[in-house]
Amino acid sequence: DDKGNADPSKMGEIVSLLESIKGYDLADRMRDNFISSMQLASPEIMFSVRYLAPNTTHSMDLYYAAWTTCGVTRDLVDAFECTDGQKWGESPLTVPVNESLLATGELGDANKAERAKLFQNRDRRLYETVCHSGEADFSMDGQEGGSVTITNQMQTGFGMMKLIQPTKEMPSYSTISDADVIILRYAEVLMMIAEAENEANGPTQKVYDAVNQIRVRSGQPELPAGLTKDQMRERIRNEWRVEFVFEGHRYFQLKRWKLMDKLVNGASDPALPTYVKVFKPAFYYFPLPQSEIDKAGGVLVQDPNYK
């Protein structure tokens, strides 16, 4: 509805429809779905836009690695739990950091060492999703050697790891990228089951089973028993966030949940304090194009929130 609440009467039908989907499973690792050489065999990918070198390629490695056109905020890094399932900063596994060294995009040794502390004792998906200080560690993908320098610039000190292919050198104009772009994977089906079932009936075992499959895959503990419906909703929403980073879901989910004005408006990053996000209530809806209003001869009137 206009407050972001789900209609419980419709959720049961949605769950039944989602449970009728057969023939798919989770890949061994979340990141396996995004490595070009492993995508064709992935049991998780349901729909994707296919690429195949040398005729059909793109430049995501150049854009997201060398050029760092997709910045990563500290707020996103903090969204990933520690390995005990507790929030970073609340978990006893939290490694204290010098915030003054983190509030900058500088790539010096001291800054790098401090950022590395944020990556200790964390959900494995953080390592599969985010890199820092201009380097990426592809050893998890079976590549020998240590970290690889993939860029000489990161405005916040953090960058994308998830969609970058394993490499031994910084991507350049000659880098050919042909990883498929995923539209839908089975993990999303499980998350939709969990969200719809929780809205319909609260945190039933069906909700726990769906979410825990994804959590256990990443090495995280199962969700604690006894969560309320509201608590489960918050856990589900964070699970959506950390599992599907850079896959095009977050913006539309925050609009669907009517949380853009609460979580996005006024948001900034410590490394870029002069850049502050603005989101007005009117932005939940698209304005009528002025050209269409002009052609309608007075029949169409602009949303008053845009006036």
Protein language model features and the residues they cover:
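Helix-capping and short linker residues that terminate individual alpha-solenoid repeat units
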Residues: 24-26, 219-220
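N-terminal non-cleavable signal-anchor helices
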Residues: 16, 28, 36, 149-151
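Intrinsically disordered or highly flexible coil/loop and linker segments, enriched in small
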Residues: 135-139, 203, 220-223, 242-246
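Extended, hydrophobic/aromatic-rich amphipathic alpha-helical segments that build helical scaffolds
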Residues: 1-21, 47, 118-131, 181-214, ...
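Aromatic-rich beta-strand patches that line glycan-recognition/binding surfaces
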Residues: 25, 29-31, 143-145
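Surface-exposed intrinsically disordered loops and tails
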Residues: 2-14, 89-110
